[in-house]
Design a protein with these regions (language model features):
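Catalytic core of carbohydrate-active enzymes
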Residues: 1-207, 213-214
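Beta-rich accessory regions
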Residues: 133-309
Length: 309
């Protein structure tokens, strides 16, 4: 039918990839009494945090469930409130910049295969890349990095109570994002040949340098939409990955616009006309004015307006 079976399969696979994140969250519940799932008002003292009852925190990620049917244009509308800050949808990579102190209310559009799950700037999200249903500590880890300042400690343990902690410290300054990695604990419980795929989710055209124990080393650059490098993990040695974005914030905004316009179902001539108008915009304000005044369908305009959320 509509592909819901395949979508469910993908989310079940993603849940398995989340095990490092979920296991660490369970450890925090045990050690610090911090729940995995929390209402927004646990973290944000705002009237909106109480009014938007469907939204919740999932290990620090903001989740906005889809509670209404999709419309004929293929999108569901989700009314959301976001606190002040910068957020990235972990599935669609859409970015949202909230500058007002009291946060901002708005509407997000999503197709059947996705729901809004937003990582705040500074988030570090560990995922397993191992295949199969093994519950062993993963040999291959993917570390998703969302530009900003933050800290995350990955927790792993063994069958006899051994523990291992990997500190992941993220800083952003002077146009570069730096991820520091250092592990401590019983190294016998982690795989000897562990590799880390590090994905800088907000850098689309960038360069990276990797330092191991203060010495620069070669790293394997992988060709994904965003800047991605692979490094071999070494216990007891600090790893630093320094990433630089070669594009400005407005250039990244234009990149998102191009992606939305490519996917939009519009009359080809109208679509081409406004696409050419948009790419000539000199700044974000002008781009927003052009979108509002365009002849595009309301669903396309609403999707484009998410760029300025």
């Amino acid at each position: 039918g509509n592909g819901t079976g395949l979508i469910a399969e993908e989310f079940l696979r993603f849940r398995h990839r989340l095990i490092p994140f979920l296991y660490t969250a369970n450890y925090l519940t045990h050690a610090q009494g911090k729940p995995l799932v929390e209402p927004l008002y646990y973290e944000y003292a705002s009237e909106e945090a109480y009014r938007y009852r469907d939204e919740y925190l999932f290990g620090g990620l903001i989740v906005a469930p889809v509670t209404s049917p999709i419309k004929e244009d293929g999108y569901a509308r989700i009314n959301v409130w976001l606190p002040k800050g910068k957020y990235t949808d972990i599935f669609t990579k859409e970015e949202y910049f909230i500058e007002t102190a009291g946060g901002k209310e708005g509407v997000l559009l999503r197709k059947l295969e996705s729901i809004p799950v937003l990582a705040k700037a500074g988030t570090v999200l560990p995922l397993s890349l191992d295949n199969g249903n093994s519950v062993k500590n993963p040999e291959k880890l993917e570390i998703k990095v969302y530009s900003g300042n933050g800290r995350y400690t990955l927790y792993e343990d063994g069958e006899n109570g051994e523990e291992y902690f990997t500190d992941l410290v993220l800083t952003e300054s002077g146009g570069q994002v730096v991820l520091g990695i250092f592990g401590h604990g019983d190294a016998g419980i982690i795989p000897r040949n562990r590799t880390l795929r590090i994905c800088f989710e907000n850098i689309y055209d960038g360069v990276a340098e990797v330092y191991c124990g203060g010495k620069r080393i070669d790293c394997g650059k992988e060709y994904f939409v965003n800047l991605t490098v692979t490094v071999n993990y070494e216990h007891g040695t600090e790893i630093r990955v320094v990433a630089k974005d070669r594009k400005t914030a407005f250039e990244n905004m234009l990149y998102r616009m191009k992606k939305i316009m490519t996917e939009a179902e519009e009359d080809v001539f109208i679509k081409d006309k406004w696409y050419n108008e948009f790419i000539r915009a000199e700044n974000a304000c002008k781009l927003e004015e052009l979108i509002v005044s365009s002849e595009l369908k309301e669903v396309t305009k609403t999707k484009l307006k998410e760029i300025f959320f």
